[in-house]
């Protein structure tokens, strides 16, 4: 798939976030050595698994590296997030990553696992001796280790004004604006988005135009409000994104659909917006 580890850019113009534009081959470090040594000599039916994890510290801004950690899968939960938590708690407290709900709801633990974007809490650890490589979301500025800067992503989401807009307020202030079951069903496949950024950071068009192309996530939410029967700014919303870069950088590669942990298809929603632009 096109959103693997090749050609990743994890640098930034800011000196605080400065990183190299390539990954360094994994090498052993002394951090957590005691716990790793204990695991590697676990004997008695231990099922050892090596995790290669991207490390970069802004307080020591050299080249990033992949660091090896070995854990016993028999003493670990089944998900990649379980392994990360075990490593942080028992081997290396300096390892930094985002996580919260552990249920695929918050989207915090989005990262690149063995070349594919996904949520660590929903990705099962593959059995076998092959190493599992964990890196930050592709083509995002790295803050530290697996934590990326989501500022631009959230600003793009904010730019599509993701809230109900009315020209005619409800007759009774505070009264709910109703819609039919049929109109409500039109929002399926869009409202479930958790803004994890797996789709946008898997998109080659977004890699090369992150400042101008809104990306799959923001455009999916744009269509969510364009399709909402209660919203009265459909024309204005369409005009706001009728732009060569904001909308039409999408070339229907559909990496976004393959990467989405919720099974959504942003490419389909973007196509719907393009069709409305033509018919409008």
From Swiss-Prot:
Stretches assigned to the 2Fe-2S ferredoxin-type domain: 51-140
Catalytic activity: a quinone + succinate = fumarate + a quinol
UniProt enzyme class: oxidoreductase
Chain sites annotated for binding [2Fe-2S] cluster: 101, 106, 121
Protein name per Swiss-Prot or TrEMBL: Succinate dehydrogenase [ubiquinone] iron-sulfur subunit 2, mitochondrial
Membrane-topology descriptor: Peripheral membrane protein
UniProt record, GO biological process: mitochondrial electron transport, succinate to ubiquinone; tricarboxylic acid cycle
Major location (coarse): mitochondrion
This protein's pathway: Carbohydrate metabolism; tricarboxylic acid cycle; fumarate from succinate (eukaryal route): step 1/1
Binding site for a ubiquinone: 208
Transmembrane regions listed in the UniProt entry: none
SUPFAM superfamilies named among the record's database cross-references: 2Fe-2S ferredoxin-like (SSF54292), alpha-helical ferredoxin (SSF46548)
Family according to the record: Belongs to the succinate dehydrogenase/fumarate reductase iron-sulfur protein family.
Gene3D superfamilies per the UniProt record, alphabetical: 3.10.20.30, Alpha-helical ferredoxin
One term under GO cellular component: plastid
GO molecular function: 2 iron, 2 sulfur cluster binding; 3 iron, 4 sulfur cluster binding; 4 iron, 4 sulfur cluster binding; electron transfer activity; succinate dehydrogenase (quinone) activity; succinate dehydrogenase activity; zinc ion binding
Tissue localization of expression: Ubiquitous. Preferentially expressed in flowers, inflorescences and root tips.
Pfam family, one: Fer4_17
Positions bound to [4Fe-4S] cluster: 193, 196, 199, 260
Function noted in UniProt: Iron-sulfur protein (IP) subunit of succinate dehydrogenase (SDH) that is involved in complex II of the mitochondrial electron transport chain and is responsible for transferring electrons from succinate to ubiquinone (coenzyme Q).
Localization, UniProt: Mitochondrion inner membrane
